[in-house]
């Protein structure tokens, strides 16, 4: 299986035989799937079971002997995994004696052989029991796509050492048992580990760890106050409503604009109205030509959005998160043209002429039908040109 969407930070959940019987493992796996973990680490015999539970990336332990004798990893079931992990019940986790020299390491040999001879990614699993095991992890990282390190005591064997030495060579996964430990792993040395391997049965810890992952990926935008200098009826246009598969809070919405350098904060339809029920999943976003800010920092045309796309939700403090587009509705509606001034620059957009469409002013949530010249509204402004939604160093005139 492949991940439907990639995170810059990853949460793996450990669900091998060390966890307990299949009932215990299954409960941990299903909780992880529901929470949104990125990968499940299991023994080979559980791969098909995990596949039947849901679509998620699967990593599977394999023995050093299997990897050395069968470089294609075609031991029973292992070839179905996305990643084969070497190091369990061997020298890397302290089960076998540590080699006299790293060149004599059976695990390192197996990792190198496997990574050179198969399309399945290779992972190294290492318990950091001493400085020798740190050196083992550093060497394994040269060949392993993922280097999983389990600290016996991160206050004694600092994660900082491993991040500094191997963080850029591999995807570094730190073993944790709680959301608090995951937060520390993601923040260490400001760079942080690329991911965590969570070992817990507590459903709350699993969900909170995924929430920590999501929080570390969110950017916080600096929203400015722009002054309304003109608002006028603009006639009929094709208006776009973005209906997400996620409920939005009262202070959330999206950034919309006719000009990519200046995007207006438009509230989600979370407020009750005398005329229509609230639609907390919807942003009445403007006309088909307008830009909407995306989670990667780019923009997309409203007309191009479709079900399954990911869009950026932002609140009035500039904190962002992601939402999935469930549906896009395009209908002919009367529009306002709203022109703003910020720092001697003028930007504008078209929004529907209806009291249910609201922006954020100094007075709070305000319907576009109540806007007046001189009002100040929330704006995200950046001095950059865009081409196909990507920032470019080029002079582009928008008016």
From Swiss-Prot:
Known catalysed reaction(s)? 2-amino-2,3,7-trideoxy-D-lyxo-hept-6-ulosonate + NAD(+) + H2O = 3-dehydroquinate + NH4(+) + NADH + H(+)
One of the GO BP terms on file: amino acid biosynthetic process
Q: Which InterPro entries match?
A: DHQ_synth (IPR002812)
Q: What sort of enzyme, by top EC class, is this?
A: oxidoreductase
Q: Which domain of life is it from?
A: Archaea
Protein's recorded name: 3-dehydroquinate synthase
Species whose genome carries this gene: Haloquadratum walsbyi (strain DSM 16790 / HBSQ001)
What Pfam families does UniProt report for this protein, alphabetically? Answer: DHQS
Gene Ontology MF annotations: 3-dehydroquinate synthase activity; dehydroquinate synthase activity; NAD binding
* Reported function: Catalyzes the oxidative deamination and cyclization of 2-amino-3,7-dideoxy-D-threo-hept-6-ulosonic acid (ADH) to yield 3-dehydroquinate (DHQ), which is fed into the canonical shikimic pathway of aromatic amino acid biosynthesis.
Keywords, comma-separated and alphabetical: Amino-acid biosynthesis, Aromatic amino acid biosynthesis, NAD, Oxidoreductase
Question: Family, per the entry?
Answer: Belongs to the archaeal-type DHQ synthase family.
